[in-house]
A protein has these predicted regions:
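Helix-to-loop junctions at the C-terminal end of transmembrane segments
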Residues: 73-86
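Juxtamembrane intracellular "pre-TM" segments in multi-pass secondary transporters
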Residues: 2-27
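Intracellular juxtamembrane helix-capping segments at the cytosolic ends
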Residues: 126-140
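Paired small-residue
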Residues: 112-120
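Multi-pass alpha-helical transporter architecture, strongest
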Residues: 182-207
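Extracytoplasmic gate region of multi-pass secondary transporters
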Residues: 20-74
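A late C-terminal transmembrane helix in Major Facilitator Superfamily
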Residues: 139-184, 195
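Structural signature of the two symmetry-related core transmembrane helices
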Residues: 89-103
């Protein structure tokens, strides 16, 4: 049975309005950048660590603790976020861990790489958890939350899909990992800025 035209209009309303929402775009861009950070790290960290002097087995193994602490961050951070009036500092601090992680891998000693990788794991997991919980925290209705989720995840993962490829291209272009690591550290800073903005109290109806 066909749905009445009025029902279809009401159902599509939140999805159309969401694209004109400043808050929705902040959440979407934050979602995209934090996804780039995660996928770049799991795609290229073993190669980076090997070039820094770590043996292949140890470099590959380093992803395991990173993903474990990432899972913990993605589970725990939304619990803290739900108890806060706004999440701007939680989000900025989580992304700052990625700045320290990538920056440390870029400029620090390989002996400190395990520490920086753990910080990166906590940061990437926490930012992911916050991005997901923003779908409900920045919405007044389930329809808005669904529309925001669709917008943020579709655009966010499209952005993320290009991240590892461009990171590898920068390596090929420059002939070293310093340039792409400097760029991804910069992307981490941008993620913190958008995360701070997306974490401020408000919803998708705000202008």
């Amino acid at each position: 049975t066909a749905r009445p035209q009025s029902d279809l209009s009401q159902a599509s309303g939140p999805r159309l309005r969401i694209w004109r929402s400043r808050v929705a775009w902040l959440v979407t861009i934050f979602m995209g950048f934090q996804s780039i950070l995660f996928y770049v790290s799991i795609s290229w960290l073993p190669d980076i660590l090997q070039e820094r002097g770590m043996n292949a087995e140890q470099a590959g193994w380093m992803l395991s603790p990173m993903q474990l602490v990432s899972m913990a961050g993605s589970f725990l951070m939304p619990l803290f976020a739900a108890r806060s009036d706004n999440q701007k500092w939680l989000t900025a601090a989580s992304a700052a861990l990625c700045v320290i992680g990538f920056g440390g891998i870029w400029a620090g000693s390989v002996s400190l790489a395990p520490l920086f990788i753990l910080l990166l794991g906590v940061g990437s997991g926490s930012t992911f958890g916050l991005a997901i919980v923003f779908f409900s925290l920045r919405s007044r209705t389930t329809e808005q939350a669904s529309a925001l989720s669709g917008m943020a995840q579709s655009i966010g993962y499209i952005l993320a899909a290009f991240g590892p490829t461009l990171f590898g291209y920068l390596h090929d272009l420059s002939g070293n990992w310093d340039t792409p690591l400097a760029v991804i550290t910069g992307v981490s800073i941008i993620t913190a800025l958008f995360g701070y903005a997306a974490g401020r109290k408000g919803d998708v109806d705000a202008r």
